């Protein structure tokens, strides 16, 4: 599948892109290409969106002579390790797809399954993140699908490339996005995904749904967002990726948990408590009046909802919120 970025390239750049991808497919580390100036332009997209070539280091050198231009990649693993990891990844992914994916599921269902699998099976590699400028191969797996799928420990690049790889295996269009992740304290380079669900492009950031959750608070704050919503704490070059213009497949919209008023929130909580749901999660619509009031009123509304439940008793609740995305999670303790 040709990437969105590829479709924006001119003829010469496309030719160089194809020459590099074809060379990598044949296992080459030195590849002759048609243009020196095109190499840097296409290399990042190839690194991101061909995660099956996990053994190439994220460095590329282009050497120009009178007769030709040669692109040279560094190899991050031995040949025996490459074959071992290829075999392990193939076996793992085939088993996962056989057990979890079927033709009766919608694309939304499939993206949700992939999101949850990666979110729940991977530990964020804080040590690798702290040594981002390390010039050795000590942390190389944290940045590719070996770390994500085999070692179950990686940074955002590994999460995003694993999501891309799994989507490729089940026929869902997906891209790795490079940009900046921000909060009130800090900002740093970050990677996440854009997926195509029934013709609707949506942002998915598995890393942040993984990092901001604990054992009691699973998070869906970054599952299927439009450009406007994710831009609250992410920035990227929009020219390089398809526009995400709708929240049609947002997790909270699909689950009727996108809240825009106090009355709607109270009813949502009453219904959730009455069903004795173990974990309750909702998103406040940023464009609603409630968004400016929620932090001063959510506790009061929660207590009103508890008191309005006739047949359910709640002894205690735990609440956590994700401030930038206005996502709230409640874990109630029901009393028999």
Give the location of each predicted region.
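A mature extracytoplasmic/lumenal domain signature
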Residues: 75-77, 180, 208, 286
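A short, highly charged nucleic-acid-interacting micro-segment common to nuclease
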Residues: 145-159
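Linear, non-domain "peripheral" regions
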Residues: 1-96, 290-296, 301-336
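Alpha-helix capping and helix-loop boundary segments enriched in small/acidic/polar residues
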Residues: 84, 150-154, 178, 183
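Hydrophobic (often cysteine-bearing) scaffold residues that line and stabilize catalytic clefts
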Residues: 89, 110, 155, 159, ...
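Low-complexity, Gly/Ser/Thr/Pro-rich intrinsically disordered linker/tail segments
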Residues: 215-336
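Secondary-structure boundary elements
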Residues: 78-148
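Hydrophobic/aromatic-rich core segments of domains that either
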Residues: 158-228
């Amino acid at each position: 599948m040709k990437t969105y970025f590829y479709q924006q390239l001119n003829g010469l750049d496309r030719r160089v892109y194809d020459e590099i991808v074809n060379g990598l497919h044949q296992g080459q580390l030195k590849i002759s290409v048609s243009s020196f100036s095109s190499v840097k332009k296409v290399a990042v997209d190839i690194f991101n969106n061909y995660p099956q070539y996990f053994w190439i280091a994220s460095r590329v050198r282009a050497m120009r002579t009178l007769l030709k231009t040669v692109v040279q990649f560094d190899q991050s693993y031995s040949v025996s390790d490459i074959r071992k990891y290829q075999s392990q990844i193939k076996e793992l992914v085939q088993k996962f797809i056989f057990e979890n994916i079927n033709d009766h599921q919608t694309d939304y269902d499939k993206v949700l399954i992939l999101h949850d699998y990666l979110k729940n099976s991977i530990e964020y590699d804080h040590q690798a993140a702290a040594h981002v400028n390390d010039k050795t191969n000590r942390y190389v797996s944290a940045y590719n699908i070996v770390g994500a799928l085999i070692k179950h420990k990686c940074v955002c690049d590994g999460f995003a490339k694993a999501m891309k790889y799994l989507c490729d295996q089940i026929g869902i269009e997906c891209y790795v996005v490079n940009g900046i992740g921000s909060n009130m304290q800090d900002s740093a380079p970050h990677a996440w995904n854009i997926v195509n669900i029934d013709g609707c492009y949506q942002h998915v950031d598995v890393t942040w749904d993984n990092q901001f959750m604990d054992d009691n608070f699973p998070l869906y704050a970054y599952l299927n967002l439009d450009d406007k919503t994710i831009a609250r704490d992410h920035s990227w070059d929009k020219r390089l990726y398809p526009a995400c213009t709708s929240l049609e497949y947002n997790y909270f919209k699909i689950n009727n948990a996108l809240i825009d008023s106090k009355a709607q929130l109270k009813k949502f909580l009453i219904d959730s408590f009455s069903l004795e749901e173990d974990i309750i999660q909702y998103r406040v619509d940023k464009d609603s009046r409630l968004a400016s009031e929620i932090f001063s009123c959510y506790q009061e509304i929660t207590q009103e909802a508890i008191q309005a439940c006739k047949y359910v008793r709640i002894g205690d609740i735990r609440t956590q919120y994700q401030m930038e995305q206005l996502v709230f999670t409640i874990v109630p303790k029901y009393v028999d």
